[in-house]
Amino acid sequence: MVDQAVLDKLETGFSKLSSSDSKSLLKKYLSKDVFDQLKTKKTSFDSTLLDCIQSGIENLDSGVGIYAPDAEAYTLFADLFDPIIEDYHGGFKKTDKHPPKDFGDVDSLGNLDPANEFIVSTRVRCGRSLEGYPFNPCLTEAQYKEMEEKVSSTLSGLEGELKGTFYPLTGMSKETQQKLIDDHFLFKEGDRFLQAANACRFWPTGRGIYHNDDKTFLVWCNEEDHLRIISMQMGGDLGQVYRRLVHAVNEIEKRLLFSHNDRLGFLTFCPTNLGTTVRASVHIKLPKLAANRAKLEEIAGKFNLQVRGTRGEHTEAEGGIYDISNKRRLGLTEYQAVKEMHDGIAELIKLEKEL
């Protein structure tokens, strides 16, 4: 049974959301009917509807406004998650199934900007959740420590180009911390959206960063997701970046079991990342197109691309440099997601040259 204090918070939160002019997908799809149907349910990890929606209630300017506290939440609270997923992921219906993992021909993607005129850097990342553990809000301190132990010992077995060092955030020296900040590797305690979702408990316990010696391969442990696996480098050689990521994921997958769902693909804390979990992005200078951000976003939208500021979500473009990535991660294969970004960026560069 969901206890009364939680129910009271839910009722208060629901009326706050209903009377607000929030533009979030949560507000759009959390009808009174759906609310009444879901408010008394809880998963085997004791997660309730409140765990899913509290960030969206606290931050009425959220775009989405919902997180999954554990893998079960996607099924138990499907009446709310499904329409939000369908809306965000371009018509992925509740009868649709995400295709099996397919990285495609890793050698078929090349350098998007051989002359180094436009693209500053290229990055491809994916997220993974470890089977048998809930997501951030439900993790105990002991589980955080156990997961960090598993992840660091797994990563220490990587060889060749992926060989590197794991740095726990707990007890990290000021020097190491500064070095990681200078490299833009260090993640900070979550923003207000993640804070409100209870994704930052026991910080910095269980959190850590691994990177290879070349600083082109990076793993975040227990940031927003259990694992964020990242491949990146300066310039526009998407092919090389993607190849490295695929190699890394395959190596890690031999050693760790990931949380996967037949319908939704790989499971993540935020429903925007479901499926492939792949976000392929460039930091790019398009001075002519970017003179009008609204116009840039409109053109990018035609290619299913998302425009963000230089430092990611909720930031401005510094020095005219934008972060542009694929928007769709669900209902298509990993290769298709990256190819969509590849083709879209190629088009944007072509348009920039024509202006």
Swiss-Prot record:
List, alphabetically, the InterPro entries matched.
Answer: ATP-guanido_PTrfase, ATP-guanido_PTrfase_AS, ATP-guanido_PTrfase_cat, ATP-guanido_PTrfase_N, ATP-guanido_PTrfase_N_sf, Gln_synth/guanido_kin_cat_dom
Residue positions annotated to bind substrate are 63-67, 224, 270, 313
What's a Pfam family this protein contains?
Answer: ATP-gua_PtransN
Q: Name one GO cellular component term.
A: extracellular space
Listed GO MF terms:
arginine kinase activity; ATP binding; creatine kinase activity
PROSITE patterns recorded for this chain?
PHOSPHAGEN_KINASE, PHOSPHAGEN_KINASE_C, PHOSPHAGEN_KINASE_N
Q: Which residues form the Phosphagen kinase C-terminal domain?
A: 118-355
- Which PANTHER family does its entry note? ARGININE KINASE 1-RELATED, ARGININE OR CREATINE KINASE
Query: What does this gene product do?
Result: May play an important role in the energy releasing mechanism in the visual system. By acting as an energy shuttle and/or as an energy reservoir, ARGK can provide both spatial and temporal buffering in delivering energy in sensory cells.
Recorded protein name is Arginine kinase
Species source reads Apis mellifera
Gene symbol here is ARGK
